[in-house]
């Protein structure tokens, strides 16, 4: 039997694309800025 590989882990998602991770780098801050400008309700995961 094969493993379910499509589940997704919330901890991993946060570590890769959470708000605090975005704020660490210049490009991440640019992502947040762009999403704010577009009026996104969710800026990061």
Curated annotation (Swiss-Prot):
GO biological process: translation
Annotated signal peptide: none
Compositional bias per record (Basic residues), positions renumbered to this chain: 10-45
GO terms, molecular function: structural constituent of ribosome
Keyword annotations: Ribonucleoprotein, Ribosomal protein
InterPro entries cross-referenced by the UniProt entry: Ribosomal_bL34 (IPR000271), Ribosomal_bL34_CS (IPR020939)
Pfam families named in the record: Ribosomal_L34
Region of interest called Disordered, as start-end residue ranges on this chain: 1-45
Family named by the database record: Belongs to the bacterial ribosomal protein bL34 family.
Protein name (record): Large ribosomal subunit protein bL34
Species whose genome carries this gene: Synechococcus sp. (strain WH7803)
Taxon lineage: Bacteria, Bacillati, Cyanobacteriota, Cyanophyceae, Synechococcales
């Amino acid at each position: 039997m094969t493993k379910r590989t499509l589940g997704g882990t919330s901890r991993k998602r946060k570590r890769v694309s959470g708000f605090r991770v975005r704020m660490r780098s210049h490009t991440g801050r640019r992502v947040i800025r762009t999403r704010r400008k577009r009026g996104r309700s969710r800026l990061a995961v």
